[in-house]
A protein has these predicted regions:
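Amphipathic terminal alpha-helices
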Residues: 260-268, 272-300
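Catalytic helix-loop patch of NAD(P)-dependent Rossmann-fold dehydrogenases
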Residues: 45, 80-129, 149-155
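Glycine-rich "substrate-gating" loop/helix at the edge of Rossmann-like oxidoreductase active sites
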Residues: 96-97, 127-135, 153-165, 191-194
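Alpha-helical substrate-binding/gating segment
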Residues: 113, 142-149, 158-211
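Conserved Rossmann-fold NAD(P)-dependent oxidoreductase catalytic core, especially the SDR/UDP-sugar
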Residues: 49-99
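Terminal hydrophobic/aromatic helix or amphipathic segment near a protein terminus
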Residues: 207-255
Length: 300
């Protein structure tokens, strides 16, 4: 599509962001450093300072609208989340992970910049995104298909969000940026709707893609074995100056409930998932079979 102009730059450099946003009417600020394995300074530079650069570029060019992609992890305090609304989720006093802390700082700055006259902003946050080209969530589980085991009892429930449902939420976010909108300066979570059992969701992915069922393997005790092991890995990593993939944060995310009430997004943004779970999985499965498996299919 010749209407799309590609620009490669560094989000941490103000001059690059200024050049990329010149001529825009609305910015969807989606770029972020994600995953739990980077250094604190890198998270801060991209997710906080990068957002400040986007705000500055918007003001420089007179861009009045910005939709920020945030994360529900900015509200995680470590406990179960069972059907809570956004209004019931506060920024925690202590963050579980550097990524969440940096995203929260960026989101706060973006919402503070909204004055409802010269600049309008809203934060839209998907939870556990999956779909074609997913190289973070499903990829990291599937690549370890042979050795992965269920953590805990395997009954924990989460919300997931198909990537096109997420994109739909972002588009609706832009439409809600106008004077007097109830969405201004607000944080909304978008999901596929009904929550799922995390390990059932993963097990279906494994079986449909030709890997052994997780439910047929022995389970690993979560809080009494995997969590202490994760803390041990953290300690060793600190001494060695490196990060292991097994962290207390990642173990906790595999054990707790994380599902949300999305009525606020429905009411204020008009959000409804545009793909059903079955439709979403069909598209996801096709990509993983046709593109992902030929490259990564052997697993570990």
């Amino acid at each position: 599509d010749d209407r799309i102009v590609w620009f490669q730059g560094d989000l941490t450099k103000q001059s690059d962001v200024d050049a990329a946003l010149e001529g825009a009417e609305c910015v969807w600020h989606i770029a972020a450093l994600v995953g739990p394995y980077h250094k604190r300074d890198a998270y801060d530079a991209v997710n906080r300072v990068g957002t400040l650069n986007v705000i500055a570029a918007c003001k420089k060019h007179g861009i009045k609208k910005c939709v920020m992609s945030s994360s529900p992890s900015t509200r995680f305090d470590g406990g179960d989340i069972n059907g809570k609304r956004e209004s019931e989720l506060d920024f925690p006093k202590t963050y579980l992970q550097e990524y969440a802390e940096s995203k929260a700082a960026g989101e706060r700055a973006m919402m503070d910049a909204c004055d409802g006259v010269n600049f309008f902003s809203v934060a839209v946050a998907p939870h556990q995104v999956y779909g074609p080209r997913d190289m973070l969530f499903l990829h990291n589980f599937l690549i370890n298909a042979k050795r992965l085991r269920i953590f805990g009892n395997g009954e924990n429930v989460i919300s997931v969000c198909y990537v096109d449902n997420y994109c739909h939420g972002l588009i609706l976010g832009e439409r809600a940026l106008y004077p007097g909108s109830p969405a201004l300066k607000k944080f909304y979570i978008c999901t596929d709707g009904e929550p799922v059992k995390l390990w059932d969701f993963l097990d279906k992915a494994f079986v449909d893609l030709g890997y052994p069922s997780l439910r047929k393997k022995f389970k690993l005790p979560g809080w009494t074995f995997m969590m202490p092991l994760a803390y041990a890995c953290d300690a060793v990593g600190y001494v060695l100056g490196k990060k292991f993939k097994l962290t207390p944060f990642s173990v906790r995310m595999l054990l707790i409930n994380r599902w949300f009430n999305i009525e606020a997004a429905k009411k204020d943004l008009g959000y409804e998932p545009i793909y059903t779970p079955d439709e979403a999985w069909a598209k996801t499965r096709a990509w993983f079979e046709d593109v992902w498996k030929p490259k990564y299919g052997a697993g570990r």
